């Protein structure tokens, strides 16, 4: 599906209570996660839910926004990305180390949020950003604000003189 013109059939609706029950599990394989998500679909003919469905569901806020902002990624992908994020955002966000998307990432994000319930969002290092709130507007405005902070930081940075030289194997 193209997110620029996605229609309702491309947005698989799930039973949130069924998905949230998965939070109690210690382990869940990718195959079992997909099966559980498909079992929670309101319409069995819908496409598979996103690999990040659990992550959204495990955060308790009413509205959860998530993006892979170029600006945030440009900051977090630095060797000292976690330090830069702490400098930029202070206590407004909590940082989550990189973990492949799926059950383990969802569990990690939920644990990080539980330790920091007053944050406006989560920065997932080398992945993206989540913001949340009790209204869609609050979650959205937090997203715009936090991404803008990263954009301003990048605008102040001096560009690198060159990238490391690489070659394809022969």
Please give the residue ranges for each predicted region.
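Glycine-rich flexible loops
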Residues: 1-170
């Amino acid at each position: 599906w193209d997110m620029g013109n996605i229609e309702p059939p491309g947005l698989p609706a799930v039973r949130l209570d069924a998905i949230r029950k998965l939070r109690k599990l210690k382990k869940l394989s990718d195959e079992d996660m997909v099966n559980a998500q498909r079992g929670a679909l309101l319409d069995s003919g819908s496409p598979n839910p996103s690999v990040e469905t659990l992550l959204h569901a495990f955060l308790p806020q009413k509205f959860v926004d998530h993006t892979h902002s170029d600006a945030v990624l440009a900051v977090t992908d630095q060797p000292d990305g976690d330090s830069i994020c702490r400098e930029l955002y202070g206590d407004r966000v909590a940082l989550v180390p990189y973990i492949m998307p799926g059950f383990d990432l969802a569990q990690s994000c939920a644990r990080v949020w539980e330790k920091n319930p007053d944050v406006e969002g989560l920065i997932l290092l080398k992945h993206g950003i989540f913001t949340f709130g009790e209204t869609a507007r609050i979650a959205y405005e937090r997203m715009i604000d936090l991404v803008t902070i990263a954009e301003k930081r990048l605008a102040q940075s001096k560009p690198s003189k060159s990238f490391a030289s690489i070659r394809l194997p022969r």
